[in-house]
Each structure stands twice: as C-alpha cells, then as structure tokens.
C-alpha cells in the first residue's frame, strides 16, 4: 500500500508534463501566420525576434515587412 502513495505523485507529474507538451506544436504555425519564419538560435541580420517556434528555434520577422 505504501507503493501507491509513492507512485501517485509520479503519475501526476507525468500527466502534467504531457498536458503542456501540446502547446509547442502550434507555435510554428503561429509564427508563419504572423508572416515570420523560424531560425536556429538567432535571427539573421535585418530581422527581429517576434517569439519562439520551439526550444532552440526563434520566430523572426523582417524589419521592412
């Protein structure tokens, strides 16, 4: 019975992590919708950071439109 008390927080922690993982999937399409593009680690020159596509990719937007 003690194992159940130890496993319950672990199961809840896994469920919490799975619930938040779906948020990262829509960010890339949100970036394209804002007429931006995804770049690895830094945006090229003449662009601004307008958000994040994923952990290592930034959403970049051109300065001139």
UniProtKB/Swiss-Prot annotation:
Gene Ontology terms, MF aspect: CCR6 chemokine receptor binding; chemoattractant activity
Highest taxon above the source species: Eukaryota
Disulfide pairings: 31-59, 38-53, 43-60
Record keywords: Antibiotic, Antimicrobial, Defensin, Disulfide bond, Fungicide, Secreted, Signal
Induction conditions: Induced in the theca layer of the F3 stage ovarian follicle by intravenous injection of LPS. Repressed in the granulosa layer of the F3 stage ovarian follicle by intravenous injection of LPS. Expression in cultured vaginal cells is increased by LPS and S.enteritidis. Expression in the kidney and liver is not affected by intravenous injection of LPS.
Compartment(s) of residence: Secreted; Cytoplasmic granule
Protein's UniProt keywords contain Secreted: yes
GO biological process, one term: killing of cells of another organism
Protein family according to the UniProt entry: Belongs to the beta-defensin family.
Protein name per its UniProtKB record: Gallinacin-1
Organism from which the protein derives: Gallus gallus
């Amino acid at each position: 019975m003690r194992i159940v008390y130890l496993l319950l927080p672990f199961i809840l922690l896994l469920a919490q992590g799975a619930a938040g993982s779906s948020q990262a999937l829509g960010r890339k399409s949100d970036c394209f919708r804002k007429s931006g593009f995804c770049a690895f680690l830094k945006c090229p020159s003449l662009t601004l950071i307008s958000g994040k596509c994923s952990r290592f990719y930034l959403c970049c937007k051109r300065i001139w439109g």
